[in-house]
């Protein structure tokens, strides 16, 4: 649901001036509130039209994602591309493809993530060995292995497409410029991880306005906590 939210809320960045969009998110709270509201209005609409069932979402959290889809009980599922190789191995006779999210009037959007960080502590006891490990993990051949296992796309130049052909439609979307990072580095705060309170409210039947205010408050609380830590350190 967070990916659906981002695809709809960030539509102006995907099809317009992304730099101006993120600058406004960082500096104009009224613009931020309108952006959040656009995303939550979309989720509330999907909920009210029963495009997703709240009880089923609870079951998905507690069980294997995709079980209803692969069993033929649902015509489609919404999930990360990382699940495509898993589903393909679990149901070898099941045929499917992974497509961008069709959530805007201007076209479908692929929501991207960069969430596999590797780092080495300069204060560690075995820095040379740790550096060697990271160098090995980030070699082109190992990046290819990792991406194939995750249904992901390599950041390396001239890298081949993933071995999992089911996710190839996503590349066409990205190649056409219809992709957006859910945690864009131009944002000065981590909006992606502050959406949960608003989404939980949507699932409980609350309004898009209530969900928006919940996330605004979560962002304020996070900022105050950050400033408090900086004050103690100084």
Each model region followed by its residue ranges:
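Long, aromatic- and glycine/proline-rich binding clefts that accommodate carbohydrate-like moieties
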Residues: 92, 147-201, 229-234
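Beta->alpha turn/N-cap motifs
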Residues: 62, 79-85, 116
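Short helix-initiation/N-cap motifs at beta->coil->alpha
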Residues: 55-70
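Extracytoplasmic/periplasmic substrate-recognition and gating elements
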Residues: 88-153, 197-201
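Extracytoplasmic/periplasmic solute-binding protein
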Residues: 1-28, 74
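Paired acidic/hydrophobic, glycine-rich loop segments that form the ligand-binding mouth/hinge
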Residues: 75-80, 97
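Glycine-centered hinge/linker elements that transmit conformational signals in sensory
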Residues: 19-58
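Non-transmembrane alpha-helical segments in soluble domains
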Residues: 40-48, 66, 70, 131-138, ...
């Amino acid at each position: 649901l967070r990916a659906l939210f981002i695809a709809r809320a960030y539509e102006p960045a995907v099809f317009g001036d992304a730099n101006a969009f993120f600058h406004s998110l960082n500096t104009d709270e009224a613009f931020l509130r309108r952006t959040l509201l656009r995303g939550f209005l979309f989720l509330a609409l999907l909920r009210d039209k029963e495009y997703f069932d709240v009880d089923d979402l609870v079951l998905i959290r507690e069980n294997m994602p995709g079980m209803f889809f692969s069993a033929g009980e649902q015509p489609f599922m919404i999930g990360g591309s990382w699940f495509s190789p898993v589903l393909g191995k679990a149901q070898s006779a099941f045929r499917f493809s992974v497509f961008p999210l069709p959530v805007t009037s201007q076209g479908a959007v692929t929501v991207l993530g960069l969430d596999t960080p590797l780092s080495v502590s300069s204060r560690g006891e075995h820095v040379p060995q740790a550096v060697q490990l990271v160098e090995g993990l980030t070699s082109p051949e190992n990046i290819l292995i990792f991406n194939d296992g995750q249904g992901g796309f390599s950041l390396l130049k001239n890298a081949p497409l993933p071995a999992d052909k089911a996710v190839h439609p996503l590349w066409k979307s990205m190649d056409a410029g219809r992709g957006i990072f859910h945690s864009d580095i131009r944002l000065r705060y981590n909006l992606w991880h502050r959406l949960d309170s608003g989404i939980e409210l949507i699932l409980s039947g609350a309004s898009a306005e209530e969900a928006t205010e919940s996330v605004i408050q979560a962002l304020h609380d996070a900022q105050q906590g950050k400033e408090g830590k900086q004050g103690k350190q100084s």
